[in-house]
Amino acid sequence: MDFSGKNVWVTGAGKGIGYATALAFVEAGAKVTGFDQAFTQEQYPFATEVMDVADAAQVAQVCQRLLAETERLDALVNAAGILRMGATDQLSKEDWQQTFAVNVGGAFNLFQQTMNQFRRQRGGAIVTVASDAAHTPRIGMSAYGASKAALKSLALSVGLELAGSGVRCNVVSPGSTDTDMQRTLWVSDDAEEQRIRGFGEQFKLGIPLGKIARPQEIANTILFLASDLASHITLQDIVVDGGSTLGA
């Protein structure tokens, strides 16, 4: 896939899937701007903007400045997200609200600042990263799953609103992926193997392909959906989970 000369924005680009996606776009020739609350490396092969996606005023300020400096935004990837674990009746109000503020509100803020640009240029692609937790309930993940389900609905609604302008909007829903977020759930030396086998007591199936996804595998799907190879694909949600949701 060739993104030479394309202008691409990726949120959550400091680490994990967002970082892998930003790198993949750079390797494909794109001019990439990555957004995150913090960037811990001294150097990155793409432009970086420190920004809290949950802060609407900050998002507006940064996006308006960047859009004034460019003629076209070819692709937007909403990959910023957080995970707060806890049973529904034990989860703090703060954790619930913060999860929605970042996972749903963050994308909403980016949509609000970029939709007019996409309409004016009559083209482009948006890929939003949800989760297989939006498809299958998980014990202790009510906030995360609910936020990702809301995010999916939001992204597809935006896709319908922009379709008449030739803008494609799709969703990628990863399963367990080898990121810092995933590793916070691993509390034993064999946690990865346990996840692959599944947790019957939690009604959580294993992974038929027998492995945890690599961030690059999620990034590959994102790049495909943003590319001309997917020129007639919009309003779709591709689950990349090694089969763990059994197509649910």
From Swiss-Prot:
Gene3D superfamilies: NAD(P)-binding Rossmann-like Domain. Keywords: Enterobactin biosynthesis, NAD, Oxidoreductase. This is 2,3-dihydro-2,3-dihydroxybenzoate dehydrogenase. It catalyses: (2S,3S)-2,3-dihydroxy-2,3-dihydrobenzoate + NAD(+) = 2,3-dihydroxybenzoate + NADH + H(+). Belongs to the short-chain dehydrogenases/reductases (SDR) family. The keyword DNA-binding does not apply. InterPro entries: DHB_DH (IPR003560), NAD(P)-bd_dom_sf (IPR036291), Sc_DH/Rdtase_CS (IPR020904), SDR_fam (IPR002347). NAD(+) binds at residues 9-33. One of its GO terms (cellular component) is protein-containing complex. Its EC number is 1.3.1.28. Inhibited by cis-2-hydroxy-3-cyclohexen-1-carboxylate, cis-2-hydroxycyclohexane-1-carboxylate and trans-2-hydroxycyclohexane-1-carboxylate. One of its GO terms (molecular function) is 2,3-dihydro-2,3-dihydroxybenzoate dehydrogenase activity. Pathway: Siderophore biosynthesis; enterobactin biosynthesis. Involved in the biosynthesis of the siderophore enterobactin (enterochelin), which is a macrocyclic trimeric lactone of N-(2,3-dihydroxybenzoyl)-serine. Catalyzes the reversible NAD-dependent oxidation of the C3-hydroxyl group of 2,3-dihydro-2,3-dihydroxybenzoate (2,3-diDHB), producing the transient intermediate 2-hydroxy-3-oxo-4,6-cyclohexadiene-1-carboxylate, which undergoes rapid aromatization to the final product, 2,3-dihydroxybenzoate (2,3-DHB). The lineage of its organism: Bacteria, Pseudomonadati, Pseudomonadota, Gammaproteobacteria, Enterobacterales. Induction: Under conditions of iron deficiency and by the fur protein. One of its GO terms (biological process) is enterobactin biosynthetic process. Homotetramer; dimer of dimers. EntA and EntE interact together. It comes from Escherichia coli (strain K12). Substrate binds at residue 131. Transmembrane segments: none annotated. The keyword Oxidoreductase applies. The active site is at 144 (proton acceptor).
